[in-house]
Amino acid sequence: MHAHASRPQARQTTLLRRAALFDFPASADLSPGTEAARHHTIQWLSRFGVFEGHESVAEYDALRFDVLAGLFYPRATGADLNLGSDLVGWYFVFDDQFDGELGSRPEAVARLVADVIRITEEDTAHGRAQDGEGPLLESFRDLWRRISSGRPQVWRDRFRHHWLEYLHSYHREALERTGALPGAGGDAPRSVEAVLALRRHSIGVQPCLDLNEPFGGYTLPPALHGGFPMARMREATDDVVVFTNDIASLDKELAVGDVHNSVIVQWERAGGELEDAVRHIADLANARYRWFEETAARLPALLTEAGADPGTHHAVGRYVDGMRHVMTGNLGWSVRTARYDERGTEAVSGGRQRPWAQLTGAEELIRAGRGAPLPPLGSGSGSR
């Protein structure tokens, strides 16, 4: 009894010890609207049938995705924070669909991705659910409508581009799991850089960053958003979140055999102790974060040299804060969520999946995928 009770404490101690390797803070700057967003998102997902009962709701609630949203958007409240919380919640529900057989069936994954993309192509004012779509797609249609409605076209195009990169990464991960890509499944150890190129998309950070613009009441010009140094700062934000997530989720992913983890890849390549690989990845995260802060300190002068007006200075400052909130907020959530502690590991061990992990009609998708032509992989795979 005593030994069993100590296991969660030991797992939490390991997580906190690893988190202490990061030189940047774990944010506790939580939006005052977080508790309201917590209840809103559970009700929203429940309305579409994502949860089968009270136990499923309780398991989801223990993961506190609302806290992640509240740390990402500490100045947002009301409808804005509710939308951010719904996006984060949907992300993780969607991600959990791939923990079983579906994640190793590229044809089925491609069809699911195509179904989600189809919704992004609909007229947001007149899009209608199709028969048999199910909770995942029906909830996404509602989410997409609320994200897109009333936004500037330049922002909508930006968000959709990032969203498609995120979606296509699931297909590429499935191809890698089955050795269907050149170099995948071979004898040569994978590289951290190659895994990172894919994880920058699958981590889903860029759409979360995009929401900072409508929440803050501004839209960055494409040349500024996509130019130096902002594009590189966004990539550094991706990398810090990826490395943080890979360290926080390491025990869970070792338990389920997930290979898309930079720590595991570093361990495969370098050998030695697992904790040596953890320290190496933490060092990479720290270097990215230091570069980010050094560049952020130079930004006002760079903008002045470029002739930026006060409004642009203010918008860029808000966006830089948004990137910082995502990096530090992700770490703050990672050390307090049940997703990465003993409960989180046991919840996906031994073939078990989350109660909401069967929303895709995976068996039908898998059957439909056999022998049928695939939709195109799209431009989202690989590095930007």
Swiss-Prot record:
Keyword match Magnesium: yes
Disulfide bond entries: none
SUPFAM superfamilies: Terpenoid synthases
Binding site for Mg(2+) 2: D95
Gene3D superfamilies in UniProt: Farnesyl Diphosphate Synthase
Cofactor binding note: Binds 3 Mg(2+) ions per subunit.
Residues that hold Mg(2+) 1 according to the record: D95
Pfam families per the UniProt record, alphabetical: Terpene_syn_C_2
Keyword vocabulary terms for this entry: Lyase, Magnesium, Metal-binding
Alphabetized GO MF terms: metal ion binding; terpene synthase activity
Binding annotation for Mg(2+) 3: N245, S249, E253
Catalytic activity, reaction form: (2E,6E)-farnesyl diphosphate + H2O = (+)-isoafricanol + diphosphate
Cofactor(s) essential for the protein: Mg(2+)
E.C. number(s) listed in UniProt: 4.2.3.157
Family classification: Belongs to the terpene synthase family.
Function: Catalyzes the cyclization of farnesyl diphosphate (FPP) to isoafricanol.
This protein's name: Isoafricanol synthase
Source species taxonomy: Bacteria, Bacillati, Actinomycetota, Actinomycetes, Kitasatosporales
